[in-house]
């Protein structure tokens, strides 16, 4: 990633250019990213192809001010961290459903490993998740504004991530390339069984909570208080995307047939 792109990316998330790669810088970038670059599946509902290249993701997230899902968000964030001097690896993960009784296929999720004096799990692409990177080699609970997290060993040398006692996903501790995720990314876009095709969704952290648009509903959470507003017209939906995410969409996202 060229330095002009790095500066534009940092401007996108409201971050200064760091002098060196430190854990404090990593935590700050992680929090800012979650507050400014939303987790969203709108490309699927706007008939926009998702292309997993650094150039395409930079155009979408930095140039056009959009968001994306895990492959896009964590894939590009990893490139930013590399350009800033961090030692980074991409990791494939399975999502743990129904308390861990269901384990989805590997490559269902992309996470990032950063090596500093210790290892950190970085994830800006799992929706409502940890605000800050998680310490990989820390056996005790980790308190975070989003909840209590545990990173524990799993069978076969893998690693499980739990949030408030609920299993979230299982990470395979083997370095991957972004191109390794192209086929699962295609599946998430086109397969009838992909849950990303069900409903348009866009969500990001705020300083004191979270804001989400799901279909024709606007959900706003501040602390423990949540409000839900029905967006009754197409204009209401488009206005919500612009007000809360800065998106000027030409049409309302609609589930694919």
Residue ranges and their predicted role:
Residues 1-67, 82-106, 127-133, 139, ...:
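Mixed-charge, low-complexity segments
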Residues 74-77:
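Active-site acidic/histidine clusters and adjacent loop/turn architecture
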Residues 110-113:
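Short beta-strand scaffold segments in enzyme catalytic cores
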Residues 117:
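Basic phosphate/pyrophosphate-binding loop/patch that engages nucleotide-derived ligands
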Residues 120-127:
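Catalytic Cys-His active-site segments of thiol-dependent hydrolases/isopeptidases
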